[in-house]
Amino acid sequence: MARIGDGGDLLKCSFCGKSQKQVKKLIAGPGVYICDECIDLCNEIIEEELAESGEVKWEELPKPMEICQFLDNYVVGQAQAKKALAVAVYNHYKRIQAEAVGAPGTDSVELAKSNILLLGPTGCGKTHLAQTLARMLNVPFAIADATALTEAGYVGEDVENILLKLIQAADYDIKRAETGIIYIDEVDKIARKSENPSITRDVSGEGVQQALLKMLEGTVANVPPQGGRKHPHQEFIQIDTTNVLFICGGAFAGLDQIIEARTGHGGTGFGARLRAVSERSTDDTFSQVMPEDMLKFGLIPEFIGRLPVITNVRSLDRSALVRILTEPRNALVRQYQRLFELDGVELEFEQPALEAVADQAMLRGTGARGLRAIMEEVLLSVMYEVPSNPDAARVLITREVVLENVNPTIVPREFTGRRARREREEKSA
């Protein structure tokens, strides 16, 4: 860089042209100089670009129909629940993006978030729906078990530990965590014992509901980075839950009876109409749930008010379970076929065998969650034998294998080779 005059005190910044006397600091490089003001400006530009790249663009937010189509690739059935979730999630992140970009009208109308309550029996896809949504939107996702939570000051997990799981899922990026999704499972287990307020302390029921209120609504929470109360001198992490979407799920066993008592289906006395058990399913009953039913079940009014979107997932029948085995992109049958492919073996299921697996899952009452356990039992012996059998080319699973514990048929390579040659000869003829 050229000097001004003979003195060495008038060096110029190569970017802004200011002299050494006009700035606080001038840093020299090989033939160039940069001042402290230009360094600060460069840092501001870099921070702005990084912040913009980390945000979801307004035009990139998927529409509700696109969200439903994505869910269809991974979750079988549950059309009503998918529609409700898609609309709620779209409105939630649309609100966040509108506030981020300063969309017209946001100054006059403040948009509140709508948390979601999912009702339905175990193994019907509540957790899977929430996980798939988070994966599609590329936002941090955390699952919490409500049964482990207790009121502050008692043995158990604090509600702030839920937020710690979300922060960990975001790799401690607080800004990302503040737009994440938290799924609180088994939320029906924190219902109080009766609909009337109790004079005794309910530390794992109503006390947990009270502790969750501010978090669901939106507050700046202090989260212990090491969890729990074992490290009293640790510095807390602050996270704003205003834009965190909470999805609460539970089986709510017994809620159907409360709804039926309100709607008048069934009844008692000499003039009451006797109703067959199969006439009205739990799924149909859950679709008519009202806030007053949740209150009678044991949720406090403040907690119900912070979960405005209530939807239910339906029980899975035999055909739905068979579809779950084969249709989704990560279907169980495809997963096991891939495992056998790694050993150079083809795995084939007959349709009656898949139906038998679905029947077993329905008998156990475990829903889709029990399918993997049944598949492991069915394939255990063949998964033990095949890796040590170099002649194995194909494994056939029949209905008898599932129901009668018969060993699967292992077809040798020589037989499959002869069959392939025969098929080629028949085609050429």
UniProtKB/Swiss-Prot annotation:
Function: ATP-dependent specificity component of the Clp protease. It directs the protease to specific substrates. Can perform chaperone functions in the absence of ClpP.
GO MF annotations, alphabetized: ATP binding; ATP hydrolysis activity; ATP-dependent protein folding chaperone; protein dimerization activity; unfolded protein binding; zinc ion binding
Segments forming domain ClpX-type ZB: 1-54
Protein family (similarity comment): Belongs to the ClpX chaperone family.
NCBIfam families listed in its UniProt record: clpX, PRK05342.1
Protein name: ATP-dependent Clp protease ATP-binding subunit ClpX
GO cellular component: HslUV protease complex
Annotated keywords: ATP-binding, Chaperone, Metal-binding, Nucleotide-binding, Zinc
Native source organism of the sequence: Salinispora arenicola (strain CNS-205)
